[in-house]
Regions:
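Conserved structural motif at the start of ABC-family nucleotide-binding domains
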Residues: 2, 17-19
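The feature captures the beta-strand-to-loop junction immediately N-terminal to the Walker
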Residues: 33-35
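Helix-to-loop junction immediately C-terminal to a conserved catalytic motif
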Residues: 48
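Conserved ABC transporter NBD signature motif
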Residues: 56-70
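ABC-family P-loop ATPase nucleotide-binding domains
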Residues: 79-135
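Catalytic Walker B motif of ABC-type/P-loop ATPase nucleotide-binding domains
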Residues: 148-152
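ABC transporter nucleotide-binding domain
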Residues: 166-181, 185-252
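C-terminal coupling/interaction segments
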Residues: 244-288
Length: 288
């Protein structure tokens, strides 16, 4: 199991995140969510060993990712861009990762290239964004790494490829009991995939919650008014207003009491989605 203890990363004088502690159990998908620039990509790069932490440690079965190079064979990061691979050919990428990952399935990735009409001599830079992203995702599956770190994995994929990839990810999880950490702004996708959710905000990485616990920490209401009030409460976040009908997120009992005191004509409870949890956590109507 991947274990993260008191992980801190500072670049120059800027604190990116500090004192992050969590685990990634086998057979789980954890969603990592946060605003743009919160530090999600930096965290993923530190977990895989591409960046050194300022403090703290990342361990695979008690072996340090940063001090024991062979421990990194248990993790694979699919980055949010192909920049680091641009001038390599597909064949060179296969050979590079086959040399590093002892359980690499060369036949798997070769079959994928044949079925997708991708010549192993093509350079990554010659592929479309979607083609390159799909190849990297299939390369991740071919490594058989027990931990996959995915940074905006479906960015650039059309709807059909996205659907097929997500199905494949679920199958992989069931068959191999892979631990997956996904950083993405595609909240609807994460809502249907993730078992757990972890937030990063103002350099604090919160311990993962189950998706059910995260959603149950908030309430979503649709209310009708004779005259819509001006909501002024830190735990009440307006999602939308259409005429005299308001949809909002309530984050606490104090917030619920405040809303009830506005005397709505009608109040309906709505199911909380991951997008609602994101908006309620990071700022409600300010970030719609």
């Amino acid at each position: 199991m991947l274990t993260v203890s008191h992980l801190t990363k500072q670049i120059d004088s800027k604190m990116i995140y500090e004192n992050a502690s969590f685990t990634l159990p086998a057979g789980t998908i954890t969603a990592l969510i946060g605003r743009n620039g919160a530090g999600k990509t930096t965290l993923l790069k530190t977990l895989v060993g591409a960046l050194e932490p300022s403090r703290g440690k990342v361990e695979w079965n008690q072996e340090s990712i940063h001090h024991v190079p062979s421990a990194r064979q248990h993790l694979f990061l699919v980055p949010d861009s192909i920049g680091v691979y641009r001038q390599m050919t597909l064949g060179e990428l296969m050979e590079f990762y086959q040399a590093f990952y002892p359980n690499f399935e060369r036949t798997y990735i070769e079959n994928y290239c044949r079925s997708s009409n991708l010549d192993r001599g093509r350079r990554v830079t010659s592929l479309s964004k979607g083609q390159a992203q799909l190849f990297l995702l299939q390369l991740a599956f071919a490594t058989n790494a027990p931990v996959l770190l995915l940074d905006e994995p479906t960015d650039g994929l059309d709807r059909i490829n996205k659907r097929d990839y997500l199905k494949q990810l679920v199958t992989l999880l069931a068959e191999r009991q892979t631990a997956v950490l996904i950083a993405s702004h595609q909240l609807e996708e994460l809502d249907s995939l993730a078992d757990r959710v972890m937030t990063i905000e103002q350099h604090l990485v919160k311990e993962p919650k189950t998706l059910e616990d995260a959603k149950s920490s908030m309430q979503k209401w649709q209310l009708a008014y004779e005259t819509v009030p001006d909501f002024q409460h830190n735990d009440v976040h307006v999602l939308s207003q259409t005429g005299r009908v308001v949809t909002l997120i309530v984050r606490s009992e104090a917030g619920a009491m405040y809303v009830n005191q506005t005397n709505p004509l009608l109040k309906d409870a709505l199911p909380v989605q991951l997008e609602d949890y994101f908006l309620g956590t990071f700022g409600g109507d300010q970030h719609v």
